[in-house]
Amino acid sequence: MMRGSTEIDMPESSSVSKGTAPLIAAPMKEKGGYKKGIAIFDFILRLAAIATALAAAASMGTSDETLPFFTQFFQFQASYDDLPTFQFFVIAMAIVAGYLVLSLPFSIVAIVRPHAAGPRLLLIILDTVALTLNTAAGAAAAAIVYLAHNGNSSTNWLAICQQFGDFCQKNSGAVVASFITVVIFVFLLVLSAFALRRH
C-alpha cells in the first residue's frame, strides 16, 4: 500500500466463482410432462372404449333374424330380447358406454392438472366397477353364444347358428367388442395406477 492512500484492497473469496450463476433444474416440469402424456393416452383409450362398448351394445341390440319360411301357426324368429342374458348384456354395455362418456371430463382434468391425485383415484375406483360389469356381461353372453353355436347334447339343446346365421354373427361380434372393451379397461387401470405410483 502507498502511504496516504485511503484505498483498501479486499481479496476475493475463493468459494465464490466469478461469472457463474447456479443452474436451476426443473424436474417437476419433466415429471408433469410425463404424467401429461399418460393422461392424454388415457383420454384416447377412453374414446376407443366408448366406441367398442357402443358397438357391442348396438350389435347385440339389433341382432334379430326371421327365417324366410314359416307355417300357418309358427314364424321362426330369433331376437336378443328372447334371452334375458342378452338383454342384460345390452343394458350393461350401454351403462358402461355412458360411464365412459361421463368419465371424459375427469380425464381432461388429469391432462390439465397432471399432478392431481384425486381425479386419478376416482377414475381407478369407477373403472374397476365398470370393468366388473363389462366382464360379467361379456362372459354371460359368451356362454350363450357358445351354446347357440355348439348346443349341448346332454341337455338336448340344439345349435341354432346353422339356421340363424346373421343372428349368431352379430352376437359373436358383440361379445368380441365387449372383451376388447375389457382389455382397454385393464390398460386404463394400469395407466392410472402407474401415474399414482409415481405421484
Swiss-Prot record:
Regulates membrane-cell wall junctions and localized cell wall deposition. Required for establishment of the Casparian strip membrane domain (CSD) and the subsequent formation of Casparian strips, a cell wall modification of the root endodermis that determines an apoplastic barrier between the intraorganismal apoplasm and the extraorganismal apoplasm and prevents lateral diffusion. GO terms for biological process: cell wall modification; cell-cell junction assembly. NCBIfam families: A_tha_TIGR01569. Belongs to the Casparian strip membrane proteins (CASP) family. One of its GO terms (cellular component) is Casparian strip. It is a multi-pass membrane protein. Residues 59-87, 142-173 are extracellular. It is found in: Cell membrane. It comes from Populus trichocarpa (Western balsam poplar). This is Casparian strip membrane protein 2. The chain crosses the membrane at residues 38-58, 88-108, 121-141, 174-194. Residues 1-37, 109-120, 195-199 are cytoplasmic. It comes from the Eukaryota. Homodimer and heterodimers. Glycans are attached at N152. Pfam families: CASP_dom. Keywords: Cell membrane, Cell wall biogenesis/degradation, Glycoprotein, Membrane, Transmembrane, Transmembrane helix.
